Amino acid sequence: MKTKTRRLLSLLNFCVLTLLACGNSDGAGEDSGVPYLAKKGEPVDGVRIGWDYGTIRQLATRGGYPRSIRLQDNTVVAVYENYDTGYEMRCSTDEGSTWGDPVILFPIHSITNDKGTARINIANSEIIQLANGDLLAACNYRPQTPEITPFAIAVRRSTDNGVTWSDPQIIYEAEPRFSDGCWEPSFLQLPNGEVQVYFANEGPYTHSNEQEISMMTSVDNGKTWGGYKTVCFRAGSRDGMPVSKVVGDEIVCVIEDCGFVTFKPYTVRTKLSDNWSSPVLADSPNRAMALGEPVEDWIYMGAPYLGVLPTGETLLSYQVDDIRHDDQLGDRLPYSTMEVAIGDKNARNFVRCTRPFPVPAGKHAVWPSVAVWDANTIAALATSNYQGGTEAPFFMKGHVMRDLEVNSSDIVNYPIFIGHTGICNLRLGVGKDADNLYITCKVKDGELYSGGQGTQKGSGVFIYLDTKNECLKEPAEGVYKVWCSYKGDITVWQGNKGKWENSELEGLQITPSVVPGGYELAFTIPLNRSFNKDTMRLCATLSTKTYTETLVHSNADWSCTWMKMNLGGH
């Protein structure tokens, strides 16, 4: 028996060794005779957001619920709740680097009537500039003592760019108790000039815990307001926190839908021509999950906000808690952070999520919003305690990046941005002519450091090129990686059957220069005959003394995730 067993084991070992000698399981081994086929992936094309750590600013000592807009004169405005004073507004004329003194638009105050005295707290700051230049500001009046005065939506107007304001005008009142209040106003102006205010409303449901989204209309730029209509309602639930935008020929309203285990961002929509003629109920085809990928029920996603880029793509911000806790149905706010997703030009399929603020475990960034300042600049705003124990409104800029259109050898713009991890950042621009590709990197790095020649560590940049636009999920022929330190130390690799191997890039020239606050690298890359003359893919990694950071949504080994470069051919 033992002899037979040994013979059987010997036979099995022989078979295994024979199989191994014949090559790997996919038949792509060197000796298999089968050509190597690199793994391909889906290209990551379109909009990316590069958050700028160096632009983080705290807007007040204590407070929250920040929102922002850019005015027609290019001034940037931020509004927020100050927990000590009320609703404040600050302005910036240098793109958010510095902010003027705060102006109180809605002060915390008291109301006394025959039922008693109640302190009126101010919440849910919002602001809009209308097409005619007027400013409208809105907030939520929240009486601290019940049964004295109603919860309400209040509005003020300015016709001189915020220098002076009308007296507060209460446009809607709910009930005088927290369980039957109204909340979270937000503005929208339609192409025909009609101004709308959306808000969450418990007023119609005093005998249940239900809530709807209501909307009121002004046809005279906010001077007077009509009655409200119901935008959406899920029976037995609480649609909340509405923000609406015009998207194509539709009005799209993003809400937190509470009809699940935990909140989720949903969209409800109507044609502009229909303008909410009937409510969007739970089973309506006009109600849909906003995110483009499935989300598990236990993950909390609340407080959504919607933005639309001038080029049509859409942005969705919300607060998310995706960490398991002992009490999954308890208060999720202490664990939540801000997230931003990118949607298509129909405000659907929001994907490519990023988290702007550096929030550690045990801290939070909540009640967020995303503001579109222009085609290339957005702002993330949130209430956070990430710098200490006190909640405060914070602001951070983001750079909107798109597929590159390269048609000239002159590099005048630097659209690629890397700088989310820390104070160092990289701005990268590309040019080309009939013979060469030109890449210039401008790096802000206040502590230049060299790990030594040949180490590829310290202050420097990795550049990645998929010269054939193969969109691969591994390094392969025609895909290059180039390292250059701030001193000009250079290493080149080329992909080979799933690995990086030391190589050369014929004719490559790199000119380094140290400048105040950092350094610059100028790459000249000859356009080899094997290169795709119309389209390539590009990626970069910024290296510093203490960390590295790769272009957002990119994997340094997967060229399918790199940014598309349209070169226009020859």
Explain the meaning of each model-derived region.
Residues 444-452:
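Short amphipathic, basic-aromatic surface patches that mediate peripheral association
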Residues 436-445, 519-525:
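Short, well-ordered beta-strand segments enriched in hydrophobic/aromatic residues
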